[in-house]
């Protein structure tokens, strides 16, 4: 018998929606009497339902206990607008005599995400009274039933993603006793966002937190600058230091490239005031991390927020990731498939079409693209030596600048010329190929480099991979990532070291942090960085993948040791509350 009803309201981006959905699945597994209503954009729900990582949606294992409510426009309509915006952007760049490869304006994905967030905020304010009263929710246009009344009754708790503004006002307008919970990505980002100056993408909250600390500890002298610096860090020209974190000082010049002034001015960008309202109203702060990764940062948060419960979600999440790793290990053992030694790997091209070719099977019939990708990847990895594959994925929203991408591919081609064991698995994140995601003026050069890599026989380009499978395959030695926290956590759980090329916001915080715990190499991304400086940084990082690299060997060793600690923590399989 269902006895409790919880609302989860999420920011409309896969990087935020997926961990909240994983959290929902973990809670549903542990509590048979729980029902969860998950609210996000229609677009993100459609994406989650189509991703292999969301088995709890694909096979509906929780039935009516996991209720999905999408807001905003249908997925196909959003995808069409995305395509139109991409075409317009590329046309503008093509018409320009000097294409702007470092545009200050937001990418189409960011614009559409902000639009979807606006609709979530607006729609939630409209439907919350109905959900709170536990009445049936009907569509305003055709009067169809969108969400039936919950058999467990009205919600007792609402879990809100930290990015969504205006939620406290809506909830408290209709309920004074509904328990509120804030969902955050990781404690390092939480601290940096709340304390860091705006110039590095933070919200400048040092003074407010100091006032709160003094009010909570009357014996403290508000003018004690030494204690203030010790607890909250200090700002000096060019750097920002976070106490309690191994991350040390963030270079302000580098962060400026990612802080994006246009983003800070977008109406839906959460301000410090909005986040602080949510934190103040919340009974608990849930953080998607592991104690083995962020123990110092979590201790610091406990000190800054002594009256809040801090929940660590990592051990209770990523169940699908771990299950796939176990199945992969069993499959390799059962079929007596040993990853081939370096000398026995074939040097012939994989049996996949070059970029842009149609997907057909042996009879000339079209094959499902996702299934075709799965087969290609499995074959490619099976033919690869242990640790020889560098896997590259920048997620669904980000791409390197075209000039940087060209240099990246040239350096990778050079590395392949030095060693026949260097192999590359590159996923486009939904694009048809690399060239199609760049301004037309760069497409010929990028397409030529793609073809050169393909002809080497050591490269596989696909527009989709099962990342859970790939990261845990013994052939994969390195993960070149944009530094999204979900990808970072998956890489840590797989014991795979990272090469991080951050593009935006929290990604650089993550890159700095994982570099500080010595499981990642962070490529430099300073503001107005010259192509020559980027080349130097990328070349230094990619040499870590060489078997003889001492630095690379140490990063790999550290990643494997961290994986063992995470496995021990995961054995608890519970949300830990401080």
Curated annotation (Swiss-Prot):
Gene3D superfamilies: Glycogen Phosphorylase B (3.40.50.2000). Keywords: Glycosyltransferase, Transferase. Belongs to the UDP-glycosyltransferase family. Residues 347-357 have a biased composition (Pro residues). It holds the Pfam family UDPGT. It is an enzyme of class 2 (transferase). It comes from Mycosarcoma maydis (Corn smut fungus). Pathway: Secondary metabolite biosynthesis. Its EC number is 2.4.1.-. The keyword Transferase applies. Residues 81-106, 342-375 are annotated as: Disordered. This is Glycosyltransferase ugt1. Glycosyltransferase; part of the gene cluster that mediates the biosynthesis of the glycolipid biosurfactant ustilagic acid (UA). UA is a secreted cellobiose glycolipid that is toxic for many microorganisms and confers biocontrol activity to U.maydis. UA consists of 15,16-dihydroxypalmitic or 2,15,16-trihydroxypalmitic acid, which is O-glycosidically linked to cellobiose at its terminal hydroxyl group. In addition, the cellobiose moiety is acetylated and acylated with a short-chain hydroxy fatty acid. Induction: Expression is strongly induced under conditions of nitrogen starvation. Expression is positively regulated by the cluster-specific transcription factor rua1 that recognizes and binds to the specific 5'-T/G-G/T-C-G-C-A-T-A/T-C/T-C/T-G/A-3' upstream activating sequence found in all promoters of the UA biosynthesis genes. Residues 90-104 have a biased composition (Low complexity). GO terms for molecular function: UDP-glycosyltransferase activity.
């Amino acid at each position: 018998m269902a006895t409790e009803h919880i609302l989860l309201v999420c920011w409309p981006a896969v990087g935020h929606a997926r961990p909240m959905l994983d959290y929902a699945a973990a809670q549903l597994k542990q509590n048979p009497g729980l029902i969860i209503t998950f609210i996000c954009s229609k677009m993100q729900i459609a994406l989650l339902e189509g991703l292999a990582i969301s088995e709890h949606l694909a096979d509906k294992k929780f039935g009516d206990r996991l209720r999905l409510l999408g807001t905003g426009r249908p997925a196909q309509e959003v995808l069409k607008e995305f395509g139109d915006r991409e075409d317009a952007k590329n046309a503008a760049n093509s018409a320009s005599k000097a294409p702007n490869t470092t545009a200050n304006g937001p990418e189409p994905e960011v614009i559409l995400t902000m639009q979807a967030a606006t609709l979530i905020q607006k729609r939630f304010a409209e439907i919350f009274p109905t959900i709170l009263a536990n009445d049936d929710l009907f569509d305003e246009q055709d009067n169809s039933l969108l969400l039936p009344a919950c058999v467990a009754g009205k919600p007792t708790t609402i879990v809100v993603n930290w990015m969504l503004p205006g939620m406290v006002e809506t909830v408290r307008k209709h309920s004074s006793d509904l328990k509120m919970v804030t969902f955050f990505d990781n404690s390092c980002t939480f601290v940096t966002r709340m304390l860091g100056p705006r110039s590095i993408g933070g919200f400048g909250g040092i003074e407010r937190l100091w006032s709160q600390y003094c009010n909570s500890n009357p014996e403290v002298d508000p003018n004690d600058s030494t204690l203030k610096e010790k607890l909250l860090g200090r700002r000096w020209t060019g750097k920002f230091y976070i106490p309690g974190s191994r991350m040390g000082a963030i270079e302000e010049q580098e962060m400026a490239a990612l802080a994006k002034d246009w983003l800070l001015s977008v109406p839906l960008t959460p301000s410090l005031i909005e986040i602080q309202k949510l934190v103040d109203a919340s009974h608990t702060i849930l953080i998607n991390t592991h104690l083995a990764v962020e123990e110092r940062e979590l201790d610091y948060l406990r000190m800054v927020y002594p009256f809040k419960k801090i929940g660590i979600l990592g051990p209770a999440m990523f169940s699908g990731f771990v299950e796939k790793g176990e199945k992969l290990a069993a499959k390799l053992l059962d079929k007596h498939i040993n990853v081939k030694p370096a000398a026995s790997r074939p040097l012939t091209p994989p049996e996949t079409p070059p970029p842009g070719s149609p997907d057909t099977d042996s009879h000339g019939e079209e094959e499902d693209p996702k299934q075709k990708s799965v087969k290609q990847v499995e074959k490619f990895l099976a033919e690869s030596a242990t640790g020889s594959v560098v896997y590259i994925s920048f997620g669904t929203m980000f791409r390197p600048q075209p000039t940087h991408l060209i240099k990246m591919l040239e350096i990778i081609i050079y590395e392949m010329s030095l060693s026949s064991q260097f192999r590359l698995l590159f996923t486009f994140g939904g694009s048809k190929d690399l060239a199609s995601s760049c301004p037309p003026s760069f497409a010929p050069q990028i397409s030529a480099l793609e073809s050169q890599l393909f002809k080497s026989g050591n490269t596989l380009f696909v527009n989709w991979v099962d990342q859970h499978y790939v990261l845990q395959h013994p052939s994969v030695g390195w993960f070149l990532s944009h530094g999204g926290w979900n990808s970072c956590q998956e890489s840590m759980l797989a014991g795979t070291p990272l090469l991080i090329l951050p593009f935006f916001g929290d990604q650089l915080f993550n890159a700095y942090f994982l570099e500080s715990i010595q499981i990642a190499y962070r490529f430099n991304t300073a503001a107005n960085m010259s192509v020559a400086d980027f080349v130097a940084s990328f070349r230094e990082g990619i040499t870590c993948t060489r078997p003889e690299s001492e630095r690379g060997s140490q990063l790999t060793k550290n990643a494997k040791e961290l994986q063992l600690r995470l496995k021990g923590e995961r054995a608890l399989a519970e949300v830990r509350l401080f």
